[in-house]
C-alpha cells in the first residue's frame, strides 16, 4: 500500500473517495454544528451526505458507512464513527475506523482515498497521537489503493 502523509485541506486532494471522521450518529445531524472536515463537507458539498448517513441510524464506534459526495467532486464519502458520544477518540475508535474505511475502499475497488487525522480535532486528541495509531493500523492492511493522510493546514 502506498501511504503518503500530506499537509493541506482534505477537500483539495485528488482522490476517488474521502473519509469523514463523524460521530456515532446518535444526535440528529441537523442539531449539530459540524466542524473540521464535516463542516467543510457541509459548506462545500451540501447536506445530502449527512441526510444519507442519518438513514443508517446509530453507528457502532469504529464502524464506517458509505454515502454520496453531495456536490463534492468525489465518487463517495466514507463516514467513520471515530469519536464516542462524549466527543472523545480512543485507540479502538481510530484503529477500527481505519480498518473499516479501508474495508469499504477494497469492497468498492477505489484506487485512492484521503483520510483526515481521525480523533485529532473534535476527538480531543493530538495530531501525533492520531498519526501514530493510524500508521500502525495501515501497516497491517494489504491494499493496492493510494492512501493520503491529510494533516490540515490552511
List each model region and its residues.
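Extreme N-terminal starter segment of soluble prokaryotic enzymes
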Residues: 1-5
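Solvent-exposed alpha-helices and their adjacent loops that cap or buttress functional pockets
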Residues: 9-12, 69-72, 139-142
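N-terminal short beta-loop-beta anion/metal-coordinating cradle
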Residues: 49-74
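Short, basic/glycine-rich phosphate-binding loops at helix/coil junctions
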Residues: 72-85
Amino acid at each position: 500500500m502506498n501511504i503518503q502523509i500530506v499537509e493541506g485541506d482534505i477537500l483539495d486532494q485528488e482522490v476517488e473517495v474521502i473519509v469523514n471522521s463523524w460521530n456515532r450518529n446518535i444526535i440528529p445531524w441537523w442539531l449539530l454544528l459540524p466542524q473540521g472536515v464535516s463542516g467543510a463537507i457541509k459548506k462545500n458539498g451540501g447536506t445530502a451526505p449527512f441526510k444519507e448517513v442519518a438513514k443508517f441510524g446509530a453507528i457502532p464506534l469504529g464502524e464506517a458507512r458509505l454515502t454520496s459526495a453531495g456536490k463534492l467532486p468525489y465518487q463517495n464519502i466514507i463516514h467513520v464513527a471515530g469519536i464516542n458520544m462524549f466527543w472523545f477518540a480512543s485507540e479502538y475508535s481510530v484503529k477500527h475506523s481505519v480498518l473499516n474505511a479501508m474495508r469499504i475502499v477494497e469492497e468498492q475497488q477505489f484506487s485512492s482515498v484521503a483520510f483526515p487525522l481521525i480523533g485529532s480535532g473534535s476527538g480531543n486528541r493530538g495530531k501525533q497521537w492520531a498519526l501514530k495509531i493510524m500508521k500502525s493500523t495501515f501497516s497491517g492492511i494489504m491494499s493496492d489503493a493510494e492512501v493520503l493522510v491529510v494533516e490540515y493546514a490552511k
